[in-house]
Amino acid sequence: MKKNYLLLLFLSKIGLCWAQSYTPIALPSMFADHMVLQQNTSASVWGWGNASSMVKIVGSWAEKDTISAKVDCFGRWKAAIPTTKSGGPYTLQVFDDVSKVVLKDILLGEVWLCSGQSNMEWTPNNGLTDKEHEVADASCPDIRIFHVPKRASHSLQEDCDGQWDICTPEVMRKRSAIAYFFARHLRDSLQVPVGVMVAAWGGTPAESWTPTEIVQSNPNFRLWQIKQTYPWWPMEAGVLYNHMIHPLLPFTFAGTIWYQGETNRDNPHYYGILMKSMIEAWRREAGRCFPFYQVQIAPFLYKSKDNGPALIREAQEWVTRHTEETGLVVISDCVEDISTIHPINKRPVGKRLADLVLAKKYKVLNGIHESPFLKQCKIEDNKLVLTFSSVQNGIICRDKEIKGMEIAGPDGVFVRAKVVINSKNQLLVFSPKVKIPVAAKYCFDDATIGNLFNKEGYPVAPFRTKIF
């Protein structure tokens, strides 16, 4: 009897030790009820579990297909589960021999990452054109919003502690307005569910969203100047990337929209190469070249001394010319008040981003869906001849005279220019005060709002033709 008792005691202790050391299945916060998984792909799923055990994954859109993954010695596992065309609601089961996690109300559709600073973070509660109507109209059960809390970290994090919400008026009014309008226009056009993952923090520089080693490896980024100018925000290199972006990059999403740049205006000269480096670093970590579309910063009375805002806009255009799978949305005409750095007319910004995506990535829109950008400048007699992209159907001025165009001679002194639109949709720029023209610029300052558009209604992007 005593031997049996000792044997039972021994076995119970073994069982207790096993139970105490067992690690149940766990998933990062982006895998949760109400989520959207990217459709028609192999979607990455990962998490934690008991070392050396087998984890099985079953999506109810394909219940007969079970995906297996082995937990490594560090307690981590990762798998890819095939997804079908858009639909739902579905469930996703993740389990081993002991524990199970069941995610409910999952939709298959298109997923986009939305990031940047305050104009991306800006909610209807902060201010929005036609706010009450837009909020009341925001009952969209097939739009889901993943909110990433604003947190910084000096080390890479595995989770961002975010939350998925179904889009309701109550949710919409406290989430990114641009992300919502972008998602809504995508949903209406593609007729599929859309998930947007919003990781944004007002007042932050691009350096904070870039991996630390990228910033530290290039002395030209000169982060110390930003830290001196704006000491009250999380300005250190990589701290927002570590906590708010890095955990999301393994997730399978369609692409990224980005609205940032205002905080970098005091150090604009290396912003282009910084952004290019940031985009490439995100893509390397994700293991794929996902599309990346920017919003050009809006006109605002910065009262800058070194033309920093104009140089940021120029750098944003440079990024699109030198980085594959990128695009740029110009929103100068969406500004109602140049004394506010946060324009409240967010609907057209979201729609323009969506139209660019629909045309360039999904290829479901024909025609022109982006702003004209300067392609070429030639000198002919006493005039400059300017050629633009995206003006095949015409370039127009919405007023009697074109605003914001200036011309200079060899002395580099700019004066107001006269402009004629010729039959080739080129601009002829001249001034009786400039006998030998060498350069022109258009809205190349803090806050001038131009009035040149292509026939499709997109504003001509600000530019300069020569650097003095």
Question: What spans do the regions from the language model cover?
Answer:
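Bacterial Sec-dependent N-terminal signal peptides
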Residues: 1-22
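Cell-envelope and extracellular/periplasmic
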Residues: 20-468
